[in-house]
Amino acid sequence: QVVYTAAIHPDNPEYAQAVRAGIPMMARAELLGQIMANYKTAVNIAGTHGKTTTTSMLSEILLAADADPTISVGGILKDIGGNIRIGRSDLFVTEACEYTNSFLSFNPTMNIILNVKEDHLDFFKDLADIRASFRRFVERLPEGGTLIINSDIEDYEYFFKGLNVKVITVGSDPDKSTYSARGIAYDDLGRCHYTLLKNGEPYGIGEESSIDLMVPGIHNVYNSLAAIAAALELDIPIAAIKKGLAEFYGTNRRFERKGVFNG
């Protein structure tokens, strides 16, 4: 059987030869959907951007907690030596791409939506078409499944309105976000420190709410909030969450440090 990605089109020579030879064909998204259907918990991380980083953040947290997850990520995560890890637990974590509606082949129990913006307009007609695809992605959740969504997305309630799912929000506004950040500060490399809020109040006791990131930028604050929300929903201790985030230095080709010019 030949498995092909959304980047491969029917005019690809190898694809065309497989068709001529009568070899069974399967889209990569369909294969992933079949695999995750065998897991009790399947976490899908979607969004126009931030998927690889957030999937990697959550993976580092789960590894720090010895949760032994199976991981499929769209970049190279150094701590697993690639982009795939086969675990022995009943937990599957993957990034979920909207291109060609690939994520509609998945079988999630928890979905994360980081943002929804104009992208892949060679496939989607417009932003409304993209939003409709993400709505169908949420509809893939089972009754009582969990949706973690950024409340900064315009009309974010559209994505879950009328559905029987548990909704957890993250974002910049503590008044409409289950999890948000306060006192965001940066070091000289742009790496972030912040206080984690739950329903507008510092999370936990003492230093439990103090979060340190080793990756720069405000966007990674929001990526980390989504990863934290997912981890807490999976009953991961806050100590493991803090440890995993503090040990995450990014993935290859995502603002990757390559060296110092004339250094």
Label every model-predicted segment.
Residues 2:
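Cytosolic ligand/metal-binding cores
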Residues 124-131, 145, 161-263:
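Adenine nucleotide phosphate-binding catalytic loops in nucleotide-utilizing enzymes
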